[in-house]
Amino acid sequence: MEEWRIQDRMSQLADVLEAPEEHGVGSVNGLVDMLQLDLGVMVRLDADARPLLSAMKKVLTAGEMSGLDYSGLLSLLDTVVKLAPFETVLEVFSVEDIITALESDDQLVRTSCKVLAVSHPKDLFSTTRIMDVLLQLYFSQRTVPVNAVEDVFQSLCTDGLIRRRILENNYPLLREMRSTHDAILFSRYLVLMTILFRHIDRSEFQKELFVPTTEEVLDSLKKDIFLFINVAKYYRALLEYATDPGAAGGPRDWALSYILPVLHAFGHIYENKEKYIEVHSYARAYLFQLLRTVSYLEDMEVFRELDVKYLHISGDNPDVMHFMAIFNPMYLYRHHFDLLTSQVTVKPSFLPVLKNIVSCQETFEILKPALTASAILIMPYSEQMVLLGQLSSYPHSTEYLVQELPKVMSNLICNENGPISEPETIELRKKVFENLLLYSATVLNVWYEPLLDEYTNICSGKTSFVRTEVVDMYL
């Protein structure tokens, strides 16, 4: 859209916002929506945004106006401050304005957080009281727009000076929250520590702030089951960020020596699940997801120790099917080979396990003898598509599918089960085609053209037709 039109629309809205009662809230809401649409396709805003920002600030800091779409106005503010030069934004929203807003009602807190989240450079407010006030607000007993505050942390904690302001200048507050008995405030503390851990270097790491002890993990169960869930999620995040090679600054494996010993607390909780009944009822999935993350650590001996001491993976464990569906298949291959060979079967109830086994080339070799056309085609069609979606996701299993399972490929292309009415199954089948067509014509061989033709039919909504010449040739 032409710049002059944007400027005209912004000026028009600014004028209306100066006297919203005179023009009516319907007119204001309509102009806000139109400008939001106009700005939605822009990557920067060269027009002078100061009059509009000033008018928006005036309305947002005034008393609440009946019928005004404050959500839409805040969304527009978010868009404008992201597109406009930040020095322009600061001409309207001063440091004191932001602090005053943070100490006001929720609407003004959201307004100031919109501005803070896009501040440039990110360390701009590191020498002011803004982060101190924001932390006091975040850890206060009053109801606050938590997501808006956390958006600021997510944006600004990438900067070292901001992190220093939080970790050093506000150390007493963090220590207080570290030992609080308030489940809600401690959960917020864990969120903040998760955000910080993603970006800190070794010199910033403080064990007493970042690593809850074994006793604290066990105590969280006594306080609140949902607090325990947040602790389990926190430890999972620590492990993921500590071992992520793509993380900013590289993996933080130097933190593992502090994190790993505490994992025994979670193993103990699993082993004593009859004692911790609430875990089985409400937190089982979160505990298992944490254990799954441990199973994928490069040093498999960490998980092996938990397995031997607490998990006892075997055919006698009532959770064995769940374990086989989520734990690192390479770990299962190395330490529970006999379990895999004795338990693997191709049937709908085993589908979660099959998906996990297919993902690893070594465990897929164990599955091959059972992965026959008759075993697959006897499954309900939607389950067939789930399995084929997984088979078509990896080169080793795709090769087996296209070379060794012609009846399955034929059934996929010709849709011999008849018309599909369930939208989910239609999407699953379409995804299988998309997965397969990522491979070259050389890999797909005679199936390439039939797959491409049928995928075209799917996308255009045409009726499928049987390519008998391909089926007859390959069967």
Swiss-Prot record:
Gene Ontology cellular-component annotations: cytosol; nucleus
Chaperone found in the keyword field: yes
Keywords: Chaperone, Cytoplasm, DNA damage, DNA repair
Keyword ATP-binding included in the entry's annotation: no
Superkingdom of the organism of origin: Eukaryota
One Gene Ontology term of the molecular function aspect: protein folding chaperone
Example GO BP: mismatch repair
Protein localization: Cytoplasm
Physiological role: Involved in DNA mismatch repair in slow-growing cells. Acts as a chaperone during the assembly of the 26S proteasome, specifically of the base subcomplex of the 19S regulatory complex (RC).
Family: Belongs to the proteasome subunit S5B/HSM3 family.
The name this protein goes by in its record: DNA mismatch repair protein HSM3
Organism: Eremothecium gossypii (strain ATCC 10895 / CBS 109.51 / FGSC 9923 / NRRL Y-1056) (Yeast)
